[in-house]
């Protein structure tokens, strides 16, 4: 366990606050041309820090999915083996003091080497592993179990925000499942993702 402010860690975790605030359109910004334009960026830096644990352990770890048959992943879009995991927050503070009421948190799953940039699925990086199989992250906070598109900024609006209680703790529920990208072939599956904790 350790306190995190703005820090990342690969594999099943990483943590922290949110992207720094930027404005790309300064007063001296060049005039947009017919072939270009202006991009404005916004963000927020918070002073919230928490102790972050994956499934009650440390901030990094492994989530093991159950073995499934190729028959359950026979065609593109088939899913199987949904496995729950949690990211828990403890000792959350703001500038060293107790958090004000109404603070919420959610995980943002980031783009990376194991993330398919088109679909947000986690790619199988196991050499000679299962074919036509990826992993799909899921918001497990309610029965809808909607898929999370890793690396997509829309997560900030679409992922359920969970309240941080007055004691500075909360549990963020997620899941992962196999997702067929075709007719699956047998073999091992391994992947990873980096995540950050979004505080609001």
Spans of features found by a protein language model:
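Bacterial N-terminal signal peptides
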Residues: 13-21
């Amino acid at each position: 366990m350790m306190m995190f402010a703005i820090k990342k860690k690969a594999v099943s975790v990483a943590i922290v606050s949110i992207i720094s605030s930027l404005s790309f359109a300064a007063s001296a910004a060049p005039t947009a041309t017919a072939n270009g334009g202006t991009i404005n960026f916004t963000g927020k830096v918070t002073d919230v820090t928490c102790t972050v644990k994956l499934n009650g352990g440390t901030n990094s770890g492994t989530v093991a999915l159950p073995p499934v048959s190729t028959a359950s992943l026979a065609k593109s879009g088939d899913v199987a083996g949904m496995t729950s995991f949690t990211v828990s927050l403890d000792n959350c503070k703001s500038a060293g003091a107790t958090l004000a009421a109404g603070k919420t948190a959610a995980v943002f799953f980031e783009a990376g080497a194991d993330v398919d940039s088109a679909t947000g699925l986690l790619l199988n990086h196991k050499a000679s592993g299962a074919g036509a199989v990826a992993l799909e992250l899921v918001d497990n906070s309610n029965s809808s179990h909607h898929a999370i598109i890793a690396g997509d900024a829309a997560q900030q609006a679409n992922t359920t925000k969970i309240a941080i209680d007055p004691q500075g703790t909360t549990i963020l529920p997620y899941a992962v499942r196999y997702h067929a990208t075709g007719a699956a072939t047998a073999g091992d599956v391994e992947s990873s993702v980096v995540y950050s904790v979004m505080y609001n």
